[in-house]
Amino acid sequence: MVSQNYLVFVSAARQLCGVEAFSRLLARHFGARAETHVLDADMPGLVRALEGRDAVVFNFPIVGWKRQLFTPGLAAVLARLMGRDVVVFLHEWLALDWKRRIVLAPVVLCATRLAFSAPEIADEFARTRFARLVTRRRQVVPIPPNVLPVGAEKASDISRALSVQRQGGRLLLGQFGSIYPKKQSAIVLQVAAELVRQGHDVGVVFAGSFIKGLDNVEENFFASVRDLGLADRVTVTGYVAGDDELAAIFKEIDVFCYLFPEGLTSRRGSVLAAALSGHAVVVNAPLEANALGHHGLFQRLIETHAIRLVPTEADIPTVAAAVLAARQEPPEPLDAEAEIAKLWHSICEGIDA
């Protein structure tokens, strides 16, 4: 195993998407062997930054690079011309807009190593014709949570308002992460509506913000809220910058709930972050039995009942029943710090391999 020195590309964005959060955490866990570099059009600056570095690392898609059309490809070509390895992490592929895949194609062609966020992404990439043209050095890398448990909590107006609801006996159903159609956030509203129909006092907390640039996402979401009669029961926090503020919000949530079109996959860092908060997460099972086989932390969280799987195609009443059961049975204790450290060790070791 060769230990390389890395230059990890990031954006200048202040609000980080999950993929960029992973990029920055990756550089941090490599310690002195990695530096971050804001990807921009300053190629002379990149030449200087590459001094003493053996490889560059790209992660896609990063929201902060949406307007970068040629810069990623130029940076990858420059790195190869300077004799550096090019490591490319693909957290999505076919789910990306075809125009975005065209922009990324030159970078992937330059890659000396490809890493995928989940077996499903690796498989869908391998089935494309484009895959025949690129490196065969490919691996699946377990993606860690993008938000880590913190000991300190910082109360905010939002967390205080949630605390008042909870003290009044309301069950708070939660979801963490960006709100967008493929996450099926609106289905969680249906679960809440079913619980209300059964006579339970339920609120829903979305700890995150709507992804900008997607047409009518916010409007359609709030239309669903109104149609289901949940207008006075839904809280959308917007982007929460501080982990301590987020921890205070998480503290007030009774049960997290996710229902994905493809079931749970190992790239769902938001599910990991929610499960590590100490509250149970109800989520539909993966389509493939081995989807989480490479990810030790997901397996541990399922073993301790922090993650409670319902059938992949579970109907709303089944999920609602699972939420009520999870509220009554807290997860078993887990040494989150040790498990996360073990996961990062395996990630860094895998990239060096």
Where are the model-predicted features located?
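Short alpha-helical donor nucleotide-sugar binding micro-motif in glycosyltransferases
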Residues: 108, 239-240, 247-253
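A charged, aromatic-enriched C-terminal amphipathic alpha-helix characteristic of glycosyltransferases
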Residues: 310-352
